């Protein structure tokens, strides 16, 4: 078999006799133009861009960005590693550009953190022919040109002077152009803050650097203990120990819960429980973040959302406090990890179960967490179980973009479904059907959890809250993970519900009318820590009764 095609990987395009600046300029042009197509598209769609002066300003911004990219290339691409680094920049830029264009996301430190924690199943859900074509056109073509290109030979000191000269000249020209367009550019960046997260590859380089700095700082700090003074209600030998199940939803947005007013019947089980008088739905709840990486640790933290920045030193979680108070704690994981929250308590990952009914191709539907639950609880300390048990179930929920995978065939209510991960290619109704089926399955799952709790003799209760919401194409945005200050309400408005058994109602001495009055009040993930402590009757200096949703209603 002939291997002549390998010649394409050998040097073949001569730049001999031409100025070496042209080499880096070609790469800079590819990065600033092809690699920033979503940025230019977003700029062109702005209402301010509606006259000749505005279009001239866009040309000035493009020229300034290209020059800035040229400076950047000459700073990082040196002869010793020129070829691989150039291709790496193309891969990084075009991959980010694809996801920005396809899902309307932006690249910031939390988005990079999410990407770094993506498991193999999530990667498979993101692969598509469109991504392959993007990489072939955006990386393969310019990458081959770059790999085969050989700059003219020059002495070592000439290489330094050529590249440093390019940095100086490019910086001067960039500064001059920025002065010309500064007024327009500053106004655009101020009024449309997402733009600053859309400039490739600077957004990715900044995000990776910021994330590395944060993680390094956290590694150097020991885990901070909290709640060492925690204690629970004294054990009554005559009373059965309570069981609390905390279900942490995934990517469920309040806008698609019919119990909250959505027009499609996505939550019939919850509504039936509500009609029976045992379930309370809190309709005005805000998430702590717009992605799991932020929201789950924040949800179980004693710190509020504003304090849970990437500069916060790591602390123990709500589960540690419950354990210190003497409760038995079990975490069941059907997602991509507990983000450190469950590291010091008993936990089971469903990926090892391989249940024949509930698990397919390495992923499991949420009902798998109920299979063998009693047996798993029995493995916990009997002494702790005599005081009370908390079980946390971390759902697969509505994790996208493959929403159609989140509900088993027999639970699909709305058809036809979008079965593509290239969400913009689906019609709105099919996409909505796939997502609503995932919500309907969550409703079914929560109904099954309540059914299991009803079989228990002791006081039982269920708390449910989603980690964050989801965008389904509103304003061209899909999925989640937008910076919090600019995130649409679909990503931050989440469902929360409480189901209480008759025995737990007596145990808490709960005031039904009082609890119903809490349903329409504004709450957030900040209330979760204190509400769960209150539900477990745990006393600690960390507990703030005014933050406990149910405190005024328990006597």
Task: Please state what every model-predicted region is.
Residues 14-36:
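Alpha-helical transmembrane segments and their cytosolic membrane-interface
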Residues 3-9, 21-23, 35-134, 140-555:
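Catalytic domains that recognize anionic headgroups
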